[in-house]
């Protein structure tokens, strides 16, 4: 069984990744489970940069494959804010209820056709031999007028999908994994890993 360390402390992301890779013969551990405690400064200018920064930092402490992601929300009307600062938007200690309400307020009076947005996820892998792989995928939607749903996390409750007629937080985990930016990026990474392992 191949060991993969996922560079995150976010239990929601870890759960999502374990669900998506559940059909693979891999053991997925968090940094904490692997006994790795490293402070990582995510100062990249792109999602891909930040994913690689994290993966490289963890790979320096293990012989296992390391996966790291960086993801966030881009709102076109707000010049792609919050972007790579999605987790730190309004401060890292600010709740997502407050962040989500702030974004809805900033879009007050903006018509639906100008509320376009996307979730972006870049996933980087550093293999035991030092090779690096990167994938990037998106999930397109728009910012709604209200918070709805309890199945997601982060910005999911304000991110709406026309094809489902609901927010990302109202999807079942299976629906979300099938279409999400992280799900698509992980499946693309899975394909790359299968070619090189």
Language-model region placement:
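Anionic-ligand binding patches
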Residues: 2-5, 11-197
